[in-house]
Amino acid sequence: MKVNGIHHVSALTADAQKNLDFYKKVLGLKLVKKSVNQDEPTMYHLFYGDEVANPGTELTFFEIPRIAPFHAGTNSISSIGLRVPGTEALHYWKERFEEQQVTHSGISKRAGRDILAFQDHEGQRLVLTADEEGKGYGLPVKQSGIPEEFSFRGLGPVELTVPYAEPTLHVLTNILGFTEISREPVEGQGTAVILESGEGGAATEIHLIERNDLPRERQGKGSVHHVAFRVRDEEELAGWHRIISREGFSNSGIVERYYFKALYFREPNGILFELSTDGPGFMVDENLDELGQTIALPPYLEHRRAEIEAKLKPIQ
């Protein structure tokens, strides 16, 4: 069995409203679900994605008010990739970032593709990748204020930085079924091992960097919490549960998240991996034109709606 690319990436923010202002209004992503952290429902969990909330397009944020800024280092998910249609789109975004005073590093190359690295208002590290192959899922967001020919298509390569690459590489290749396709220099970072899964292409890639000269990352606002990989359905997820357990990894067991089912475990360098089913998806409780408009709760939290909403600061 092999995973089928990136399902979603989840990160941390200290302010849900400022997060929404940046990711929806500046980047033009669609808020596809305004919900809460199911393990701590007093905090927002915001899901952004493409026009129809396809798996493989979702970038999510847990709000933790007053959380301290992160300190960059190893044992971390060190950047999040977002795919755009091509290099022409990168030039559009470079101009837009300059107009919006977004910190960026200019257009460069990574793993054979043109990229534009940038940071959000909390220092979250992101990379726009020119996806000339176009293998990944993703439909342009309508009414986003961004021309469709330049707009977000979905998640791109996810970068991991670890002090010792070999144990993580073993998990990715020998357990999860990734394939190493090349080793590429990354400016200021040494060499990245480029791995792909599923159908291949930018939407399925992990870039693994070994840095034993850095301290361990301290998580906070601007850091990434976990990366999730796609699996077909609950039956396949049950098979993964058996495999992960057999390999000796402590894990969560299968967790009901309503919009998908999930399995969590930490790889040897401590990075949190999740395996998530493609379905049932984010339209199980809202129509397309309703996505992200109101606070959505899974049925097992619905009886606490009044209590939960009273503790959340309204955002729009």
UniProtKB/Swiss-Prot annotation:
GO terms for cellular component: cytoplasm. SUPFAM superfamilies: Glyoxalase/Bleomycin resistance protein/Dihydroxybiphenyl dioxygenase. Transmembrane segments: none annotated. One of its GO terms (molecular function) is metal ion binding. It holds the Pfam family Glyoxalase. Fe cation binds at residues 8, 226, 274. InterPro entries: Extradiol_RC_dioxygenase, Glyas_Bleomycin-R_OHBP_Dase, Glyas_Fos-R_dOase_dom, VOC. Binds 1 Fe(2+) ion. One of its GO terms (biological process) is catabolic process. Residues 5-131, 154-278 form the VOC domain. It comes from the Bacteria. Its cofactor is Fe(2+). It is found in: Cytoplasm. Its EC number is 1.13.11.-. Putative ring-cleavage dioxygenase that may contribute to the degradation of aromatic compounds. Belongs to the extradiol ring-cleavage dioxygenase family. This is Putative ring-cleaving dioxygenase MhqA. The gene is mhqA.
